[in-house]
Amino acid sequence: MQENQQITKKEQYSLNKLQKRLRRNVGEAIADFNMIEEGDRIMVCLSGGKDSYTMLEILRNLQQSAPINFSLVAVNLDQKQPGFPEHVLPEYLEKLGVEYKIVEENTYGIVKEKIPEGKTTCSLCSRLRRGILYRTATELGTTKIALGHHRDDILQTLFLNMFYGGKMKGMPPKLMSDDGKHIVIRPLAYCREKDIQRFADAKAFPIIPCNLCGSQPNLQRQVIADMLRDWDKRYPGRIETMFSAMQNVVPSHLCDTNLFDFKGITHGSEVVNGGDLAFDREEIPLQPAGWQPEEDENQLDELRLNVVEVK
């Protein structure tokens, strides 16, 4: 009995560390990109998945100790997918005492009508959803729209654009919406998906699966996600290094003439970012940049099968 209590204490300790890490990651992202300001009214887009639940929970937690005042309103888009449990989110949000709005739009029917059987629905579904959320943000008078994309999503987007789009383009932590009226933020930009998954398991969020994109096999994004997970297992630290690279871009050592004036280089020009290392081997650090081994990583893996709620 005493041994079981000790194990529980260790689990609770590790999970508390996990929650603090997520808080720290979100807090750093908010500060680095000035995501939240005094008086902001933030529309938290809640899909019913682990990412958006975690985002809402961490933002609520930070709200209690933040040096500025801001408010949250959770918004869910009921797309009228067959079997969608309409009661889950209202019951959850009312229990928390969170202001919320459920928007009902039959985008599922539109997507099924427009997209041939067997084709991926993500592109059209995303466009429809985005337009509805922008409209809702205006109706609610919100100043920011918060989305639940995390670090792994950002890296996946970078590789998708490189592999299929011929662009080095990721998913920005903060941007102006394509209609030019709303500021979109991604507070989980620095958070690892595996941390979010463990946190969601511990909190036992009432997860609602997506019957559209979640049920489509062989999606390009899923292939990229599997590749990154494989790299993370085989080469610890590689994911952290790649994300660090997105924050440390050197335009003079790429090939985009829009970002750097290559034509303007003449005799007498200044040496930029160390010049050319074409004749020398560049020194690469033995430990991947941005990576630190976790002393309790193995323990956290074990907790996937036996988690307790983080208070």
Curated annotation (Swiss-Prot):
Cofactor: binding comment: Binds 1 [4Fe-4S] cluster per subunit. The cluster is chelated by three Cys residues, the fourth Fe has a free coordination site that may bind a sulfur atom transferred from the persulfide of IscS.
Note: The thiolation reaction likely consists of two steps: a first activation step by ATP to form an adenylated intermediate of the target base of tRNA, and a second nucleophilic substitution step of the sulfur (S) atom supplied by the hydrosulfide attached to the Fe-S cluster.
Single GO cellular component term: cytoplasm
Name of the gene: ttcA
Entry's localization field: Cytoplasm
Gene3D superfamilies from the UniProt entry: HUPs
Enzyme class name: transferase
UniProt-listed Enzyme Commission number(s): 2.8.1.-
Designated name of the protein: tRNA-cytidine(32) 2-sulfurtransferase
Taxonomic source organism: Shigella boydii serotype 4 (strain Sb227)
